[in-house]
Regions:
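Ribonuclease/tRNase effector modules and their secretory precursors
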Residues: 1-103
């Protein structure tokens, strides 16, 4: 299982990578790298995806620099992490806590 402290350590040690595709999606969604960093620093893991390939990943919820809830999907590659995607959670898809998916 991935833990938030490990993801925070990756950030503190410049071991987090963002693909060009993910960076383009952030721009489209109005998300800045500093928002993602803040979300990781303030966040908690809300879902684990241990079977993801090629590396396990997780969904965390934290706050942007403007204190907006932000979801970030990150991998744990053993010695680094990759940002897979980030988005502002949609209240139509998430319960009011923004941590629980609606069914």
């Amino acid at each position: 299982m991935i833990d938030i402290e490990r993801l925070q350590w990756y950030y503190d040690n410049d071991r987090v990578f963002i693909t060009a595709h993910a960076a383009e999606r952030f721009r489209q969604r109005g998300i800045k790298v500093k928002d993602i960093r803040n979300a990781v620093k303030t966040g908690e893991i809300i879902e684990q995806y241990p079977e993801d390939y090629p590396y396990p990943s997780c969904l965390l919820m934290g706050l942007s620099v403007k204190a907006q809830p932000l979801h970030v999907v990150m991998s744990d590659e053993g010695n680094a992490s990759r940002i897979i995607t980030a988005y502002f959670p949609d209240v139509d898809k998430w319960e009011s806590d923004l941590k629980t998916r609606k069914v």
